[in-house]
Amino acid sequence: MNVTKTFPTQEVGHVIEIGHPTWDEEGSQFSVRSRRQNRNGGFNRGSPETPIGDLGGIIAAVAGEDLIESTEIAAMLVALSASLIRKLGS
């Protein structure tokens, strides 16, 4: 993954990365990775890389099973609302 932006989390050794996926030779797509360190401090190869286009379906499936905590839902709604306002304004 060609990382273009990194977001820290509250968990030590865990960051969220956004960038161009390994499978996109043209660099026109985006993916997200939940990157975790391994025991030695290096990159855990089990850290999943997911196409941005898959996130909506994943979140809808998990939300449909009531598996997301209320506080996480609220934070997502705030972030998604802000994104929608930015997109509608442009």
Identify the residue ranges that each predicted region occupies.
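Negatively charged, low-complexity tracts enriched in Asp/Glu with abundant Ser/Thr
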Residues: 1-13
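Generic cytosolic/nucleocytoplasmic N-terminal low-complexity/intrinsically disordered segments
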Residues: 1-4, 28, 43, 86
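Extended hydrophobic/Leu-rich segments
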Residues: 5-7, 18, 32, 73-80, ...
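A short, structured beta-strand/loop element
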Residues: 14-49
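Mixed-charge, Lys/Arg-enriched low-complexity segments
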Residues: 38-90
